A protein has these predicted regions:
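A helix-centric hydrophobic-segment signal that preferentially recognizes long
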Residues: 1-206
């Protein structure tokens, strides 16, 4: 009996060590996986910002071009300029935190969608101005804008896909336990919300 008890104690120690090793390995694997997926989300968020910035950069030339058209509706291009200004006034914290903060994401998205809607209205209004339809500079800007809107739709989807991959991994057992242990750095990623027509490229027939 005296020999059996030490053996049982030894077995218990080895079992505890084995369980501990499994937990540590699982935690390390989960941590590394979350880091990799989080970096993927951040990289894709950078791409989203790039295409939105590209669109914002087109606005000044576009507004300047339509302002040159005789009797062009002033309120239309003013709305575009104001929406563009609102995008530019988004605080760096909102842009930075949008990935992890649904409220910041909603604020970012609202500003961008407002600009997209204003641009769509402007391009539709252009149909009433033959001189703009024949303006080579405007046609170039219009083509660039449509291409950029298409890229925005693509990059938004890629971002949402990356965020979904992260969130799925983060909320799967036992990774969710480790993610909660590690804290805010592995909080769920925010999504872009689908809004009918908000992100479709403006279509104008010339």
């Amino acid at each position: 009996m005296q020999q059996v008890q030490p053996r049982r104690a030894s077995y218990a120690i080895w079992i505890a060590l084995a369980i501990g090793a499994i937990v540590v390995i699982s935690m390390i694997s989960s941590y590394n996986g979350l880091v990799r997926l989080s970096q993927g989300v951040d990289a894709q968020w950078g791409q989203v910002q790039n295409v939105y910035q590209r669109r914002a950069d087109l606005v000044p030339n576009l507004v300047a071009t339509v302002k040159g058209a005789a009797n062009f509706e002033k309120s239309t291009y003013i709305a575009v300029a104001q929406a563009r200004a609102s995008v530019g006034q988004l605080s760096p914290d909102v842009v930075k935190n949008a990935v992890n903060d649904p409220k910041a994401m909603a604020q970012f998205e609202q500003a961008q969608n407002s600009l997209g809607s204003a641009l769509s209205r402007l391009l539709v209004t252009v149909e009433n101005y033959p001189q703009l339809k024949a303006n080579e500079n405007f046609l170039t800007l219009q083509a660039q804008l449509e291409g950029t809107e298409n890229r925005i739709a693509v990059e938004r989807k890629r971002y949402n896909d990356a965020a979904q991959a992260f969130n799925t991994r983060r909320n799967t057992f036992p990774t969710n336990l480790y993610a909660n242990f590690f804290g805010a750095q592995f909080s769920n990623k925010a999504y872009f919300q689908a809004q009918p027509g908000a992100q479709s490229a403006p279509q104008v027939t010339f």
